[in-house]
Amino acid sequence: MKSATRSASSPFFIPEETGAVRPIGGMAKRSFDVLAASVALLLFSPLFLLIMALVKFSDGGSVFYGHRRIGHNGQSFKCLKFRTMMEKGDEVLEEFFRINPDAYEEWRATRKLQNDPRVTVVGAVLRKLSLDELPQLLNIIRGEMSVVGPRPVVEDELELYDSAAVFYLRSRPGLTGLWQISGRNDVSYATRVAFDTQYVQNWSLFADLVIVFKTIPAVCLSRGSY
């Protein structure tokens, strides 16, 4: 993996020459991650293949989408998802912002749009059910993510974390976490940062298990997902 690109004076990243800081949870958390992700990948493999077919045949485009996110110790990795947007989504979004300046303010504040013009019909269903994130099980097995942890962010989002960024960087980003079970997109970005900080400061394997079990009703009820 490549290191995130920022100046050496940045407070957000731990310089490589100082040595890597071990992620929270150590071997216990990593063992749980590998076991849980492997079992989930096996159990959901029929659904995985069905979604692959639906995405491919919906518009003939690519099945997966990988976007660069910042992980543990500031390392950059490609966060995998099933593609839920049009192939030329950036052009569509630029035109949408030109016509709807208020939407740009929503985007700048949360990095999300409640009515995103780039999302396909199949993609909207996958997002509503959080099924677009199933490929992140592969990120977990590869050691880039964890089952539970802070929401993976892009590089410029860490500026919104301010001094709390150091807590984000101590953990691998998670497939689920406090933010996902507490309203997701219905909560402010500042609240999301507070959730991530609280999680890292108070980590325990038992807390991870509680979050995993609470994720099930949150996903089934589509709380805050769009």
Curated annotation (Swiss-Prot):
Pathway: Glycan metabolism; exopolysaccharide biosynthesis. GO terms for molecular function: phosphotransferase activity, for other substituted phosphate groups. Its main location: membrane. Needed for the addition of the first sugar (galactose) to the isoprenoid carrier. May function as a sugar transferase. Belongs to the bacterial sugar transferase family. The keyword Transferase applies. It comes from the Bacteria. This is Exopolysaccharide production protein ExoY. It comes from Rhizobium meliloti (strain 1021) (Ensifer meliloti). It is a single-pass membrane protein. The lineage of its organism: Bacteria, Pseudomonadati, Pseudomonadota, Alphaproteobacteria, Hyphomicrobiales. Keywords: Cell membrane, Exopolysaccharide synthesis, Membrane, Plasmid, Transferase, Transmembrane, Transmembrane helix. The chain crosses the membrane at residues 34-54.
